[in-house]
């Protein structure tokens, strides 16, 4: 099975960036612990000040199962609390591999 990715493109709420970055390692650790099949999380800051949150899963099935668990993971909710309403969420698998 090819690895699967969730990629979220967003801004951070005004005035929340510093707190988000300081809380992020602990929040990521909680998410990793509670969502089976999650291989990696990377936060990428783009030149325009927006962020890509890239989650790498062992499979599409693991990513789909996580959707059901996401609401039960307090750390995931806290991460989303730093974001405004408008996010772009993309999903897909590794091509050619």
Language model features: what each stretch is:
Residues 91-97:
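Short, low-order "capping/linker" segments at domain edges
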Residues 26, 30-39, 56-90:
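An amphipathic, aromatic/His-enriched active-site/gating alpha helix that lines ligand/cofactor pockets
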Residues 4-11, 52:
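Active-site-flanking beta-strand signature of metal-NTP-handling nucleotidyl enzymes
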Residues 11-22:
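Short, surface-exposed ligand-recognition loops at beta-strand->loop->(often short) alpha-helix junctions
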Residues 40, 51-52:
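Amphipathic, hydrophobic secondary-structure cores in small proteins
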